[in-house]
Amino acid sequence: PVAGEENQYIAYVAYPLDLFEEGSVTNMFTSIVGNVFGFKALRALRLEDLRIPTAYVKTFQGPPHGIQVERDKLNKYGRPLLGCTIKPKLGLSAKNYGRAVYECLRGGLDFTKDDENVNSQPFMRWRDRFLFCAEALYKAQAETGEIKGHYLNATAGTCEEMMKRAIFARELGVPIVMHDYLTGGFTANTSLAHYCRDNGLLLHIHRAMHAVIDRQKNHGIHFRVLAKALRMSGGDHIHSGTVVGKLEGERDI
């Protein structure tokens, strides 16, 4: 029973390992939470945690690189890396967006980033944004003598289009791309993570849509589970909101 709650119980469920496809977060989630949440016998259900056997974890590639490789790429050690999201995130032309990126990087930031829904809209197509951001990046690098980065959002409507954007980012020579892993899907995210590892790109992850799944305390999936799934699927770091800002969170964490 759950302390202080009526008709709530904690259940521990174990599954044979052979029920799961190796290296597939998609299959793991389909098997564990794909159907049970819809059972009419349940009023609510929440997946609080997963304990994943080491033998299964080892079938996943995991993060493309990690913090040490990121610091080596940037040649920045012994301090936090400081960045910001470009605002207003929607409505700027690609040229004005690139200007904002330049001013932030020239002013001292290590990184700037696209926001989660900056994809390829009529006012700013993705290729134009990538080109102007790369120009801003290299201009700021030349003037400061530091290695800079901009998280180019490769999220797209199809996996093929997503990969096209990631490939173009690599051709421009930028150090990092980003992806919305929940709205984009685990299959797409894992494919992108594999490409990033093979081609030396860092991968930043945005958690857009997470609160639909994890915010209610008596139903859904705890974010620790979504974070474990992401670590298996692949991502070098994840957006978590500002320390004190507009997003819901526990202050003591």
UniProtKB/Swiss-Prot annotation:
User: Which residues hold Mg(2+)?
Assistant: 113, 115-116
The cross-references to PANTHER family, in alphabetical order and at most eight, read:
RIBULOSE BISPHOSPHATE CARBOXYLASE (PTHR42704), RIBULOSE BISPHOSPHATE CARBOXYLASE LARGE CHAIN (PTHR42704:SF15)
Note whether Oxidoreductase occurs among the keywords: yes
Name the PROSITE patterns for this protein: RUBISCO_LARGE
Gene encoding it? rbcL
Q: Per the UniProt entry, what are the Gene Ontology biological process annotations, in alphabetical order?
A: photorespiration; reductive pentose-phosphate cycle
Q: What is its EC number?
A: 4.1.1.39
Q: How is it modified after translation?
A: The disulfide bond which can form in the large chain dimeric partners within the hexadecamer appears to be associated with oxidative stress and protein turnover.
Q: What else is known?
A: The basic functional RuBisCO is composed of a large chain homodimer in a 'head-to-tail' conformation. In form I RuBisCO this homodimer is arranged in a barrel-like tetramer with the small subunits forming a tetrameric 'cap' on each end of the 'barrel'.
N6-carboxylysine carried by residues: 113
Q: Name one GO cellular component term.
A: chloroplast
Protein task: RuBisCO catalyzes two reactions: the carboxylation of D-ribulose 1,5-bisphosphate, the primary event in carbon dioxide fixation, as well as the oxidative fragmentation of the pentose substrate in the photorespiration process. Both reactions occur simultaneously and in competition at the same active site.
Q: What class of enzyme is it?
A: lyase
Swiss-Prot/TrEMBL cofactor(s): Mg(2+)
Q: Which InterPro entries match?
A: RuBisCO, RuBisCo_large_chain_AS, RuBisCO_lsu_C, RuBisCO_lsu_C_sf, RuBisCO_lsu_fd_N, RuBisCO_lsu_N_sf
What does the entry comment about cofactor binding? Binds 1 Mg(2+) ion per subunit.
**Name of the featured protein:** Ribulose bisphosphate carboxylase large chain
Q: What is the lineage of its organism?
A: Eukaryota, Viridiplantae, Streptophyta, Embryophyta, Tracheophyta
